[in-house]
Amino acid sequence: MASPVTAQLLPLALLLHAAAAAGPSPFRLSPVRVEGRLGQRVELQCEVLLSSAAPGCTWLFQKNEPAARPIFLAYLSRSRTKLAEELDPKQISGQRIQDTLYSLTLHRFRKEEEGYYFCSVVSNSVLYFSAFVPVFLPVKPTTTPAPRPPTQAPITTSQRVSLRPGTCQPSAGSTVEASGLDLSCDIYIWAPLAGTCAFLLLSLVITVICNHRNRRRVCKCPRPVVRAGGKPSPSERYV
């Protein structure tokens, strides 16, 4: 494992080297991208093209996570090979193949080893970093479900029905016949008509009753006849 000072300086060195990375790369990486599989053997190679580079190459790893920092994996030189303390040599190993060609091998690729691998060298007191080599598992294809056809809500008796004649339609599931009554439509025509007739009949009954009570009674008895003397006869006083 790298020291705390190295862990802090590596991100700064990567930023300072960003301008130089725009020019010709001093490294040749193979392969440039890996789509690994669980348990598969993955081998990465880094060839240093700088003639003035110091002997030795460092392999680094960075996870695909926010605020991830480079992690030291191995240092390879002509005289020695040094792995990070927590690494298992049976899982990750490195070697110097030629004078300027170095390799890093993941013997059994695991999910936690997904990320970016790169190498670095020192030349004339300048630290150079290679481009990232992404190593990831295959992306599972996402199947988009087919859109469901729109379904029409069934008509129920609880739904409000417009009383306008123009919107009167046959009920769901019923067949339209040339003759006969369709109660789902005719009821909205006969109900107002029956209500109007009932109102008129009730008004007529009330009018008849009121006129019968207020009618003046007419006396059918003959009135007494007044004679010339001005007094009616005793027999004519009473009717």
UniProtKB/Swiss-Prot annotation:
Residues 22-188 are extracellular. The keyword Transmembrane helix applies. The keyword GTP-binding does not apply. It is a single-pass type I membrane protein. One of its GO terms (biological process) is cytotoxic T cell differentiation. Its main location: membrane. Keywords: Adaptive immunity, Cell membrane, Disulfide bond, Glycoprotein, Immunity, Immunoglobulin domain, Lipoprotein, Membrane, Palmitate, Signal, Transmembrane, Transmembrane helix. The chain crosses the membrane at residues 189-210. It holds the Pfam family V-set. A lipid is attached at C210 (S-palmitoyl cysteine). It comes from the Eukaryota. It is found in: Cell membrane. Residues 211-239 are cytoplasmic. Gene3D superfamilies: Immunoglobulins. Disulfide bonds join C46-C119. Residues 1-21 form the signal peptide. InterPro entries: CD8_asu, Ig-like_dom, Ig-like_dom_sf, Ig-like_fold, Ig_sub, Ig_V-set. Palmitoylated, but association with CD8B seems to be more important for the enrichment of CD8A in lipid rafts. O-glycosylated. Forms disulfide-linked heterodimers with CD8B at the cell surface. Also forms homodimers in several cell types including NK-cells or peripheral blood T-lymphocytes. Interacts with the MHC class I HLA-A/B2M dimer. Interacts with LCK in a zinc-dependent manner. Integral membrane glycoprotein that plays an essential role in the immune response and serves multiple functions in responses against both external and internal offenses. In T-cells, functions primarily as a coreceptor for MHC class I molecule:peptide complex. The antigens presented by class I peptides are derived from cytosolic proteins while class II derived from extracellular proteins. Interacts simultaneously with the T-cell receptor (TCR) and the MHC class I proteins presented by antigen presenting cells (APCs). In turn, recruits the Src kinase LCK to the vicinity of the TCR-CD3 complex. This is T-cell surface glycoprotein CD8 alpha chain.
